[in-house]
């Protein structure tokens, strides 16, 4: 039996990988799980042809993970519809819609969502969006279920005793231009934690994508100029790829006494581990805001959100 897993960018960073791993573990009798890579230029007919070429029996098509673009979502919906037409069971598990993928307008091909045997989403915002699209069934909210992974403590031996401040902050000129004028407010919100050793908790490979290592390093340097980060090898891309995993990141988060982030995965791991979180939301930073709202009843004591206006365009 074959299970086809449809994701947007399944291996781009630890956040997407954590969702894929959780989904694979959660599928009963999954058989052989194949992560499908769709040609962005393929037509609906060509997508149906892809389904026909996969060795039978294809028993299940699963839509999962964080989708960022409307095109990738509509392609995946078209592929899922072809799978259903070929007799496969359709499941939506831990789906998250962000940015363009979560736009108000109902996407092409959304009718297949009403054929899902299971309709389960990662967060409340995605559930609200699906409801706005007029689906016949109400989605179930799983509330970042990948946060419950068993931590891997392999990297903890390299950390010093005492309280540690964990940071994971999205990089980019616009982001830094927004938070840097508010550094005194951030330091005040941290209180004594501003003087603790700093552990980077970035989810992207250094130098790739949103590069939250650059953002993390910039904030750490503003808080404690000249102070080296803990586990400096994580700032090297090959070392990071070799050393880190979702389970190891969760262990690092759990070792912190406070986590500062605008990333949803470190925040969700912190909530699961009982570590307070200072969320930094630049303007409408949906990922951290959605995470806080979805897990509002579980936030550890001392957690809070600091809203930061977006810097004016240069």
Residues covered by each model-derived region:
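Active-site anion-handling motifs in enzyme catalytic cores
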Residues: 1-314
């Amino acid at each position: 039996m074959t299970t086809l897993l449809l994701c947007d960018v399944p291996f781009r960073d630890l956040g997407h990988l954590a969702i894929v791993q959780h989904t694979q573990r959660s599928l009963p009798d999954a058989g052989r799980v194949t992560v499908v890579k769709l040609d962005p230029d393929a037509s609906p007919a060509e997508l149906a042809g892809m389904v026909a070429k996969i060795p039978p029996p294809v028993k299940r098509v699963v839509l999962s993970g964080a989708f960022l673009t409307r095109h990738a979502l509509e392609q995946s919906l078209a592929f899922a519809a072809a799978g259903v037409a070929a007799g496969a069971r359709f499941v939506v598990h831990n789906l998250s819609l962000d940015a363009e993928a979560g736009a108000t307008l109902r996407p092409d091909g959304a009718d297949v969502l009403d054929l899902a045997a299971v309709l389960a989403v990662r967060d409340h915002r995605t559930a609200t969006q699906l409801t706005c699209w007029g689906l016949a069934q109400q989605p179930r909210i799983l509330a970042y279920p990948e946060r419950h992974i068993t931590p891997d403590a392999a990297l903890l031996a390299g950390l010093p005793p005492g309280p540690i401040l964990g940071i994971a902050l999205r990089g980019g000129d616009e982001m830094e231009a927004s938070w840097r004028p508010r550094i005194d407010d951030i330091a005040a919100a941290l209180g004594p934690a501003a003087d603790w050793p700093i552990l980077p908790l970035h989810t992207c490979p250094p130098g790739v994508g949103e590069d939250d290592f650059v953002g993390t390093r910039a904030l750490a340097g503003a808080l404690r100029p000249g102070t080296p980060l803990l586990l400096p090898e994580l700032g090297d891309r090959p070392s990071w790829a070799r050393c880190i995993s979702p389970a190891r990141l969760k262990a690092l988060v759990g070792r912190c006494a406070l986590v500062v982030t605008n990333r949803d995965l470190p925040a969700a791991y912190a909530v699961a581990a009982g570590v307070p979180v200072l969320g930094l939301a630049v303007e409408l930073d949906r990922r951290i805001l959605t995470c806080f709202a979805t897990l509002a009843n579980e936030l550890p004591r001392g957690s809070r959100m600091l809203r930061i206006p977006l810097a004016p365009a240069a």
